[in-house]
Regions:
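Loop-to-helix entry region of an early transmembrane alpha helix in multi-pass inner-membrane enzymes
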Residues: 77, 81, 88-110
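Extracytoplasmic loop-helix module adjacent to an early transmembrane segment
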Residues: 25-59
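Membrane-helix boundary/interfacial segments in multi-pass membrane proteins
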Residues: 32-33, 38, 65-67, 89, ...
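Short hydrophobic/aromatic helix or loop-helix immediately within or flanking a transmembrane segment
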Residues: 45, 63-91
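Membrane-embedded helix bundles of polyisoprenyl
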Residues: 14-20, 100-119, 123-143
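Membrane-water interface at transmembrane helix exits
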Residues: 48, 83, 87, 113-120
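Start-transfer (signal-anchor) and selected internal transmembrane alpha helices
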Residues: 1-25
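Conserved short loop/turn motifs at secondary-structure junctions
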Residues: 32, 65-71, 87, 99-106
């Protein structure tokens, strides 16, 4: 166990920092209806209804006044699947959306760490680059 912590200490540091950066998402009064938040939540809800009704979730029949709309033309289904998995964990679509944002922050930090580590051959530099990347205004603004 000690060996595992020693081997993965930099990824654990990134994980802890990603959770600290994501703390504002845990507020209940956080407005997630900005940027693309409302579209992702509405899409996840419509996909959930399609699955519940036994329909093909590629065409969301509850949208466009019942005519259906294929939202997956513009966005892939992976983000919707993550929101629905988050909904299973948190029981709400907003909680599922926040769960997806936290997972995205964590995965982006780990991915940029791996890239920076291969590029610079230095694990501490990789952690620094990962933390700076996670703290970029784009990430913080879109959360």
């Amino acid at each position: 166990m000690k060996e595992w912590f020693k081997k993965n200490k930099y990824i654990l540091i990134i994980f802890i920092i990603a959770i600290i950066i994501s703390i504002p998402l845990f507020r209940k009064d956080l407005d997630v209806y900005f940027d693309d938040g409302i579209q992702h939540i509405a899409r996840a809800y419509a996909t959930y209804l399609s699955i519940q009704n036994g329909e093909n979730p590629e065409v969301l029949t509850s949208l466009a006044n019942g005519f259906g709309y294929s939202w997956d033309l513009f966005y892939g289904p992976f983000s919707t699947i993550l929101i629905l998995i988050g909904k299973l964990i948190t029981t709400t679509f907003i909680g599922g959306y926040k769960f997806t944002l936290i997972i995205g922050m964590l995965l982006s930090g780990i991915t940029i760490y791996i890239f920076a580590n291969k590029l610079t051959k230095s694990k501490p530099t990789g952690v620094l680059i990962a933390v700076l990347y996670m703290l970029m205004p784009y990430h913080l603004n879109d959360m």
